[in-house]
Amino acid sequence: MTEAALQQYIQAIRPADRAAMDAARERQAELAKPPGSLGALEDMSIRLAGITGQVCPKMGKCRVAVFAADNGVVDEGVSCAPRSVTLQQAINMTRRRTGMSAMAAAFGDDVAVVDVGIAADVPGVGILDRKVRRGTGNIAVEDAMTRPEALAAMAVGMEQAARARADSITALGIGEMGIGNTSTSAAVLSVLTGADIEAVTGRGGGLTDEGFARKKDVLRRALTRRAVDKDDVLDVLCAVGGLDIAAMTGAFLGCARERIPAAVDGFISVVAALCAVTLCPEVRDYLFLSHDSYEVGYRLAADRLGLEPCLHLGMRLGEGSGCPLLFRVLEGACGVMAGMATFAQAAIQDDYLDEIRAGDSFTVDKP
C-alpha cells in the first residue's frame, strides 16, 4: 500500500447512518420501559443501527482477529517474559488454550491469528502468514520500521476487515500478541497526547520495581532519540510503534470502511484505535470499548476517544480477551431492540412517563 492509496482508502470511510440512529432512538422511546432504564444498552443499540443501517440490527457470527509481532525493544529488558513467548502464545491461540481463545471457544466465536511480524519461523499451525518483517527495530536506538513497512502492516489489518465482511462476520474484535508491546503502546500514546511517559507506562506482565524503572528509562530514551511528528501517525508508528499496533490501526480503519462494529480490547488495542481515529475521525462511530483495562494509560486513550468502556472487571491480559465478552453485551442490546414489546403491543398506557420525558434527565441515586 502506498501513502496515496491509504488516503484514498480513508476518504471512502463514511460516518454512521444518522437517519437509522434517529429511527432506532424513536423505537427505544416506544419500548415498554422507563426512558433510559437500559442504560448503555440503549446507546449501543442506537449506535449499531447507525453502523448497519438497520433499526433492529442482528448479531450473528463474531470473530477476534489477533495480530502477532515481536518488538526489538525487548532487548532492553523492558519485559518480564522472553521474546519466544510471542510465537508460543500465538500457537496456543490456534489451539484455543489462551485466555481470549478459550472464552471465544466457549461462546462459539471465530479466532483469526495473523503473523504480521513474529521474529521466528512459524510452523503451519493455523497462523496466517502476513509477516512484514521479523520483529521491529529497537526503538531505544533506532526506528521500529520504515514507512513502507508501516503501510504494509496496516494493509494486513485492512485485509482482515475485508475478510470479515466476506465471511458475514457481524462484529470484529481487534487483539494482539507481542512481548514488549505495552512499551511501544506507551511510547505511541505519549507522542500522540503529549503525556509524560510516567503517566502512560505500567508494569506490563508484572515487572519488578527495578524492571519498571528500567522500562520508563528506555522509553524516555526512545522518545528523545529523534523528533517525531505527532500529527503524522505513520511517523509515530515508524519511530516508536510496533507492527501489531500498525496492523490493528489498519483493522480499525477497515472495520469503518466495511461498516462492521469493532470491539476494542485493552491498552494496546485502544492505542491503535486512537491512531485510527487520528487518521480518520469517522472511525470513532464504529468503535466499542470492551472493558476498562487496568493497564496505566488506558483511561487517557479512552478519554481522548470520547468513549466509555462497557465492562469494569480489572482485566489487563490483552490478546483481545475483552472482545468475546463485549459481543455478548452487543447481542443483548440487539435482542432488546428486536424482541421487546412496545407500549402498544404490551397494552400498557404510558401516560405515567410524561413527567420523566419532559425532564432534562433521568437519574437514579446510587447507594
Residues of each region from the PLM?
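N-terminal loops that bind phosphate or other acidic moieties
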Residues: 1-367
